[in-house]
């Protein structure tokens, strides 16, 4: 199991690191816990956060991250970074500034957070989804767009994927099981825990399951769900960010 992560809010910590695990639960940092690629070389801001990595159907590796330095303020980021590799060592990268690229739809954005990628088999494309806020009068919602064939940009302006009825939603993570798509997310500023919505379609129709799924009374974020190899167990991991550790929970459904 490969875990992509960043370590904190200092600019030296806002960089992509890797860790490995044999069991999906206990991880060992690689490269002496140092970044595997320079944030300054791949981003507009000089820092990257919230990395997510996907092994594609084509055998390549796709990674996305928030282009942000938190010292500039939590409402300061305007885009994301896309990366692609065949060997997990050598990466090509591209930056997307949303106000510049999509001025009509996203000219006023002040948060483009926690992008992730999933393969949409129905169209044979990689879908990138993230939370976006269009300025201080808006709240965070989940949007999606398809990456272009070279994974250097988006085919079109992102479309709305999930709106939690006026409540901010960040850190979306989608997994498919038995033909259904489960969208896990953080209830940002309104409970600060992990809930999910479910749909029969990847790109529409998500219905909220209105209960918290994390097993912690503290605020958590950055949820990620994956299946343990050769088992029926699924792990929901999340960042107990006020206490500086990750927690892992298991489920079979």
Task: Kindly give the residue locations of the regions a language model identified.
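Carbohydrate-active catalytic/glycan-binding domains of CAZyme proteins
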Residues: 1-253
């Amino acid at each position: 199991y490969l875990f992509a992560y960043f370590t904190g809010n200092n600019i030296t910590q806002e960089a992509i690191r890797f860790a490995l695990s044999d069991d999906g639960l206990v991880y060992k940092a690689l490269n002496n816990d140092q970044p595997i690629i320079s944030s300054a070389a791949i981003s507009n801001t000089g820092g990257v956060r919230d990395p997510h990595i996907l092994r594609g159907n084509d055998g390549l590796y796709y990674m996305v991250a928030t282009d942000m330095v938190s010292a500039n303020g939590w409402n300061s980021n305007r885009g994301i970074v896309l990366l692609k590799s065949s060997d997990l060592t050598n990466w090509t990268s591209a930056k997307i500034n949303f106000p510049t690229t999509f001025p009509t739809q996203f000219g006023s954005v002040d948060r483009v957070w926690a992008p992730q990628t999933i393969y949409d088999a129905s169209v044979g494309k990689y879908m990138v989804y993230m939370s976006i806020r269009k300025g201080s009068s808006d709240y965070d919602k989940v949007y999606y767009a398809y990456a272009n064939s070279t994974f250097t940009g988006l085919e079109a302006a992102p479309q709305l994927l999930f709106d939690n009825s006026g409540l901010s939603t960040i850190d979306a993570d989608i997994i498919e099981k038995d033909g259904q798509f489960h969208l896990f997310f953080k209830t940002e500023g309104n409970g600060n825990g992990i809930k999910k919505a479910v749909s029969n379609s990847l790109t529409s129709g998500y219905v909220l399951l209105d209960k918290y799924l994390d097993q912690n009374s503290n605020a958590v974020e950055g949820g990620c769900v994956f299946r343990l190899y050769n088992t029926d167990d699924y792990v929901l991991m999340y960042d107990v960010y006020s206490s500086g550790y990750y927690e892992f929970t298991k489920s079979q459904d």
